[in-house]
Curated annotation (Swiss-Prot):
The modification N6-biotinyllysine is found at K132. It comes from Streptococcus pyogenes serotype M6 (strain ATCC BAA-946 / MGAS10394). Signal peptide: none annotated. Residues 90-166 form the Biotinyl-binding domain. This is Biotin carboxyl carrier protein of acetyl-CoA carboxylase. Keywords: Biotin, Fatty acid biosynthesis, Fatty acid metabolism, Lipid biosynthesis, Lipid metabolism.
Length: 166
């Protein structure tokens, strides 16, 4: 992919309503994002800051290994003792689509679920907004919420964990 093609993609992304865009090729990945979490902290301090599209080119591992400098040294990683590791119990409810997660029906309403709540199969856990459509994510089984893995208004990916039910 040449520079002009990348510039064209960037211009199209900038004028679109997309918040994130990932383009994979044999050469690597091209990631565009308009999300505020990717912005430089100095921009957020300005009075009328406008989100600036961020571009990140991530090369494939074979390309990065070939171009890595010889001065990079392998450092052994020490393993942590098993006693300190935390193993969470329960099943993770995954996102069925890409979108924005909402933990409540509206900002002034209480969340659908909280840690410790008992839920019934089919009860709404989260709403995911995708293309201006609100999609309810139901509980796949009866159980107790042990962990909420996303925050309100997080941009989430397909298959990303939303809540853990035991």
């Amino acid at each position: 992919m040449n520079i002009q093609e990348i510039k064209d993609l960037m211009a199209q992304f900038d004028t679109s309503s997309l918040r994130e865009f990932l383009f994979k090729t044999n050469e690597g990945e091209l990631i565009f994002s308009k999300n505020e979490q990717h912005l430089n902290a100095s921009i957020s301090n300005q009075e009328h800051a406008v989100p600036v599209p961020q571009v990140q080119l991530v090369p494939n591992s074979t390309a990065s290994e070939a171009s890595s400098p010889a001065s990079v040294k392998d450092v052994p990683v020490e393993e942590q003792p098993q006693a300190e590791s935390f193993v969470a119990e329960g099943d993770i409810v995954e996102s069925p689509l890409v979108g924005v997660a909402y933990l409540a029906a509206s900002p002034d309403k209480p969340p659908f679920v909280a840690v410790g709540d008992t839920v019934k199969k089919g009860q709404t856990l989260v709403i995911i907004e995708a293309m201006k459509v609100m999609n309810e994510v139901p509980a796949p089984c009866d159980g107790v919420i042990t962990e909420i893995l996303v925050s309100n208004e997080d941009v989430i990916e397909f298959g990303q964990g939303l809540v853990r039910i035991k």
